[in-house]
Amino acid sequence: MKEVSEKITERIRKLIRLKESATQIGSEGEAHAAAAAGHRLLMEYNLSLLDLAGENPQNRLTACESDRISYKDAAGNIWKRDLMRVLCEYNYCKMLLYAGTTHMVVIGTEENAATVIALFDYLRKTFRRLSEEKYSGYAQGRRGYWRTAKGKKDYIRSYLEGCIPGLRMQLEN
């Protein structure tokens, strides 16, 4: 990890304060620009908000654990687990799996964990809906295997598993 100077951490703190004050006065553009600049520096130096809290215990952010979330799915379990892993990676959280089950939990600050869970629910539903829509269009021009229940399941599983690398590429940019 890069050695981060106090100058960089202080700059990020100033950007966070600027974002908060701009939000309070209703300047959405300025708040968004400050948040984007702060996020860019956090990503560049591989930092999280916990790294900026310093030694003062009252400034420390507390970690929390989400409720158990099932990643069991008729189209295969891998895509949901990978979706959660990507969302946690880009939202400063960790995902833990319960051994011998199809359950996982999110560990992170309350705000970050809530963001990950909300994104997971939204993207899970959206990817499922899109997979059905794409299959309908794909199956119209096909015969045989791709019109069977197994062909549909294979298509949807492949589509869902392919969504995750695409999401990762979008989050990297």
Task: Tell where the protein language model's regions lie, with residue ranges.
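Long, charge-patterned amphipathic interaction tracts in eukaryotic proteins
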Residues: 3, 39, 43-173
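Non-transmembrane amphipathic alpha-helical segments
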Residues: 8-22, 41
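Short, charged, amphipathic alpha-helical segments
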Residues: 28-37
